[in-house]
Amino acid sequence: MNPLDQLVIQAQTDFAAADDAAALENAKAKYLGKTGQITEQMKSLGKLAPDERKTQGAVINSAKEKIEAALTARRDALSNAQMESRLNAEAIDITLPGRGRGTGGIHPVMRTWQRVEEIFGSIGFDVADGPEIENDWTNFTALNSPENHPARSMQDTFYIEGNDTQGKPLLLRTHTSPMQVRYARMNKPPIRVIAPGRTYRVDSDATHSPMFHQVEGLWIDENISFADLKGVYLNFVKAFFETDDLQVRFRPSYFPFTEPSAEIDIAFGSGPLKGRWLEVSGAGQVHPNVMRNMGFDPEQFIGFAFGSGLERLTMLRYGINDLRLFYEGDLRFLKQFN
């Protein structure tokens, strides 16, 4: 056996002994690298006579091809073995039971929002929507709040740089009443509508948040009275709190957009809040100036309005003491409502 045949056999043996890609590359360098044995054989051809060079060159090339074939075969074998090992490690047992995906839930305030729409919708109230960035006129002036009213100060209202297309200052709405103004100016009486949505005020503590949710209701018609308003609201709170065992009372109050105005309190006949009067809403007869700004004759039509904080209703319904819990994103709290 000539030396080149022995070299091929040795290379095949070394390649077969390589158990990973790094070892195989080291073995390759021994035979096919810049200083490898086949490379050195090729360099020695220059010392031979032309006839010998041709003959010996063919022998060396044949040996080189056999070594390269052995290298390729071993490289493929290692690659296949690696893939098989990986597949075995990542194998899926199709007999195992599936793992369910975690599901989210409806936020408690959103539950209240949906329930409010459902209750008022069942007695014929529409649902209004409107922009959260409002102009000064719709948020304040149209609702009978004069320019020197404290609510207009930057200590209570988030103002935005710039004006609207009519030059009116822009702000984040402080209540959802502007949606009622917009709705009323586009519709004719009789009007029965609620306006739920996000509102913003410069306030933050255990019972207040700079962003909170309100629902406000508006009823405009002929020949309606406070008795109708009381009946509607009593129907609402009984349906919302799912009990007939409660009372409603109206206390005199003041709001610039209603006259007369009242605070609405409820008292439960049973449960942990039994006997306590709890404020849940403000209400009143729509002020004549507001009626005119909506485009109605206050001598012909009567309007009643009411408004409640959705967080307040949610806190009373579920016995929650701190408003900030709604916005901390704590799953331990939120999972209780799923």
Swiss-Prot record:
Its cofactor is Mg(2+). GO terms for biological process: phenylalanyl-tRNA aminoacylation. GO terms for cellular component: cytoplasm. SUPFAM superfamilies: Class II aaRS and biotin synthetases, tRNA-binding arm. It is found in: Cytoplasm. It catalyses: tRNA(Phe) + L-phenylalanine + ATP = L-phenylalanyl-tRNA(Phe) + AMP + diphosphate + H(+). Signal peptide: none annotated. The keyword Lyase does not apply. It comes from the Bacteria. GO terms for molecular function: ATP binding; magnesium ion binding; phenylalanine-tRNA ligase activity; tRNA binding. It is an enzyme of class 6 (ligase). Mg(2+) binds at residue 259. CDD domains: PheRS_alpha_core (cd00496). Keywords: Aminoacyl-tRNA synthetase, ATP-binding, Cytoplasm, Ligase, Magnesium, Metal-binding, Nucleotide-binding, Protein biosynthesis. The keyword Protein biosynthesis applies. Binds 2 magnesium ions per tetramer. Its EC number is 6.1.1.20. Tetramer of two alpha and two beta subunits. Belongs to the class-II aminoacyl-tRNA synthetase family. Phe-tRNA synthetase alpha subunit type 1 subfamily. This is Phenylalanine--tRNA ligase alpha subunit. The gene is pheS.
